[in-house]
């Protein structure tokens, strides 16, 4: 006697129960084909990257992405085209090329200035090569020597000492010439500005001057 069968029969005979609704749900007792349809999804989800994509290296970008990175460069942005990147590279190349030219011109101007300074230093043989630091030291010594000479001339009262006369002589050349002519012809010296105002006339017309005297 089958115990399982008798138990099931006895249970069904004495305790009838309505069938539970979950027993009729298709997802619990559906056909086996449904599991076969869903199995590829789970398999692809559980596979490693090397098994899922055998054509590509593990962890590497697809060939299309690698080609785009090679064409555009590491600094390229998605919105930029190769032509724009080439133009940008050309501008950067020109900017880098202008640096050595500026440095060369600066070096040439400094060298020419030092050559002129060497010519101003006396008693230096023509075949002597002076470095920049030696040139500056000699120029400093020569300037100190000239300042010492000027100081000695000023102390001794030598009239030939150098003095920077910025003011013109009083009266100028024209007044000196007038004084010489007056002394030569025997005329009295010219009156001062106060005497001129008292005894002489102004620039007014004769009638205006007469009216002023009659008042």
Curated annotation (Swiss-Prot):
Tissue occurrence: Heart.
GO molecular function term, any single one: protein homodimerization activity
Subcellular location: Nucleus, Nucleoplasm; Nucleus, Nucleolus
SMART domains in alphabetical order: HLH
Keywords linked to the UniProt accession: Activator, Developmental protein, DNA-binding, Nucleus, Phosphoprotein, Transcription, Transcription regulation
UniProt biased composition (Basic residues): 92-104
PTM sites of type Phosphothreonine: 107
Domain bHLH intervals: 94-146
Low complexity compositional bias, start-end: 65-89
SUPFAM superfamilies for this protein: HLH, helix-loop-helix DNA-binding domain (SSF47459)
Residue(s) carrying Phosphoserine: 109
Domain of life: Eukaryota
Post-translational modification: Phosphorylation by PLK4 disrupts the interaction with MDFIC and leads to translocation into the nucleoplasm, allowing dimerization and transcription factor activity.
Region (Disordered) residue spans: 53-109, 166-198
Record flagged with keyword Metal-binding: no
GO cellular component terms listed in the entry, alphabetical order: chromatin; cytoplasm; nucleolus; nucleoplasm; nucleus; RNA polymerase II transcription regulator complex
A biological process from GO: heart development
InterPro entries: bHLH_dom (IPR011598), E-box_TF_Regulators (IPR050283), HLH_DNA-bd_sf (IPR036638)
UniProt cross-references to Pfam families, sorted A to Z: HLH
Job description of the protein: Transcription factor that plays an essential role in both trophoblast giant cell differentiation and in cardiac morphogenesis. Binds the DNA sequence 5'-NRTCTG-3' (non-canonical E-box). Acts as a transcriptional repressor of SOX15. In the adult, could be required for ongoing expression of cardiac-specific genes.
Subunit structure: Efficient DNA binding requires dimerization with another bHLH protein. Forms homodimers and heterodimers with TCF3 gene products E12 and E47, HAND2 and HEY1, HEY2 and HEYL (hairy-related transcription factors). Interacts with MDFIC. Interacts with SOX15; the interaction enhances HAND1-induced differentiation of trophoblast giant cells.
Cited PANTHER family: BASIC HELIX-LOOP-HELIX TRANSCRIPTION FACTOR, TWIST, HEART- AND NEURAL CREST DERIVATIVES-EXPRESSED PROTEIN 1
Name this protein carries in UniProt: Heart- and neural crest derivatives-expressed protein 1
């Amino acid at each position: 006697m089958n115990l399982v069968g008798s138990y099931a029969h006895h249970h069904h005979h004495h305790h009838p129960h309505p069938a539970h609704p979950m027993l009729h749900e298709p997802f619990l007792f559906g056909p086996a084909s449904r599991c076969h349809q869903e199995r590829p999804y789970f398999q692809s989800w559980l596979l490693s990257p090397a098994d899922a994509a055998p054509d590509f290296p593990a962890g590497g970008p697809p060939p299309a992405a690698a080609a785009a990175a090679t064409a555009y460069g590491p600094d390229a942005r998605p919105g930029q085209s190769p032509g724009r990147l080439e133009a940008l590279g050309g501008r950067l190349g020109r900017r880098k090329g202008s640096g050595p030219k500026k440095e060369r011109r600066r070096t040439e101007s400094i060298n020419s200035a030092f050559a002129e300074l060497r010519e101003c230093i006396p008693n230096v043989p023509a075949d002597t090569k002076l470095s920049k630091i030696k040139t500056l030291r000699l120029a400093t010594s020569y300037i100190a020597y000239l300042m010492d000479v000027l100081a000695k001339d000023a102390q001794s009262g030598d009239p030939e000492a150098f003095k920077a006369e910025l003011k013109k002589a009083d009266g100028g050349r024209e007044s000196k010439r007038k004084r010489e002519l007056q002394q030569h012809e025997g005329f009295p010296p010219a009156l001062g500005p106060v005497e001129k105002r008292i005894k002489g006339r102004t620039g007014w017309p004769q009638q205006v001057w007469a009216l002023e005297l009659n008042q």
